[in-house]
């Protein structure tokens, strides 16, 4: 039922964003992610394969949102290792570092969306509280064009 409503609104307006769909349909954003034809769920148990793919990208656009701050980092996706219950990101070739509790990730979504009128492609990592932990976006070049090799890699993930 929800999927049909989403598809109907997308037919009416091909440029409608996922967040606008959530507002119009008065449902949570994660329900839109779970039911939109432009979003695919990625298996959490394959997260290491996903991170390996991301390390092959020229750079990533990492986004972390909190209620009072939006953190954006554009850099190579870092190498990491498991220790003390975390995936520890430490890589001299990347400014991205930190400690990820992989066990807290309950859903991963590959999403094609529209942001600020432009196509946007992201990998969203959600916790059991249905809140976004972080997201990785297909990066853009200095002309604000999507980096094609990264987009092709994203599309190959969508095809899995």
Model features per residue range: what roles?
Residues 1-132, 137-160:
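Eukaryotic intrinsically disordered, low-complexity regulatory linkers and tails enriched in Ser/Thr/Pro
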């Amino acid at each position: 039922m929800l999927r049909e409503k989403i598809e109907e609104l997308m037919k009416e307006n091909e440029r409608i964003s996922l967040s606008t769909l959530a507002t119009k349909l008065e449902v949570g954003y994660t329900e839109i992610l779970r039911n939109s034809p432009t979003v695919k769920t990625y298996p959490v148990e394959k997260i290491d394969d996903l991170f390996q793919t991301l390390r092959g990208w020229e750079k990533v656009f990492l986004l972390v949102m909190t209620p009072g701050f939006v953190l954006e980092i554009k850099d190579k996706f870092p190498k990491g290792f498991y220790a003390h219950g975390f995936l520890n990101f430490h890589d001299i070739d990347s400014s991205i570092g930190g400690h990820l509790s992989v066990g807290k990730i309950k859903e991963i979504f590959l999403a094609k969306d529209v942001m600020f009128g432009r196509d946007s492609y992201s990998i969203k990592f959600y916790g059991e509280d249905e809140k976004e932990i972080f997201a990785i976006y297909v990066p853009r070049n200095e002309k604000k064009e999507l980096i094609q090799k990264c987009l092709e890699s994203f599309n190959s993930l969508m095809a899995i």
